[in-house]
Curated annotation (Swiss-Prot):
Keywords annotated in UniProt: Ribonucleoprotein, Ribosomal protein, RNA-binding, rRNA-binding
Comp. bias (Basic residues): 62-73
Biological-process GO terms, alphabetical: translation
Organism the protein comes from: Corynebacterium urealyticum (strain ATCC 43042 / DSM 7109)
Organism phylogeny: Bacteria, Bacillati, Actinomycetota, Actinomycetes, Mycobacteriales
Protein's name according to its UniProt entry: Large ribosomal subunit protein uL4
Amino acid sequence: MSNLKLDVHTADGKTNGSVELPASIFDVEASVALMHQVVTAQLAAKRQGTHATKGRGEVRGGGRKPFRQKGTGRARQGSIRAPHFTGGGTVHGPQPRDYSQRTPKKMKAAALRGALSDRARHSRIHVIEELVPGQIPSTKSARSFLERLTERKQILVVLTREDLTARKSVANLPNVHALPADQLNTYDVLHADDVVFSVEALDAFIKAASGANKAEDQNTKEEAK
């Protein structure tokens, strides 16, 4: 594995130097099963789980026997709130539950590295100096810049939390999703056709990810002892 080099694009259509993408993050073997598990857990955690239905004992009414037991020629009934009646209770209906799944940090980190590596291998990661020049947000400028970078539809823009100008510039673009570097995740990377990093966001992400990798290696060595 060797580090990847990418040009840094500027808003005027030129390039300004290059950056290196560490092979330990952007050139690893992707595990489809692992990424699927992590994405499934992430989507499950977004579910509210507040669905609820009432059984026959919870539905209002139905305490009185609708008609006498014998002599009517009809089938005997004990309550008009039985499940087979309109307005009756639900049998085995959904109840509130927690859909979240436990996913270890190492699995999340490995899945994210695999997703980024896949995008890097297909030349779908881009690095920019700044999305919009100056301090005034401009949706038009942001859209033009992104269209020059890629013709694909779904774009994930990774920024620093302080870059409010860029975040406001892409807020109204329907197929562009902006995300702080510390919230980068497997689902958003895989959902996007292209991933665009600002230089500052890329540096922050690599620094955090490299620190996590060193901690994992240290823990592995200690466990081996």
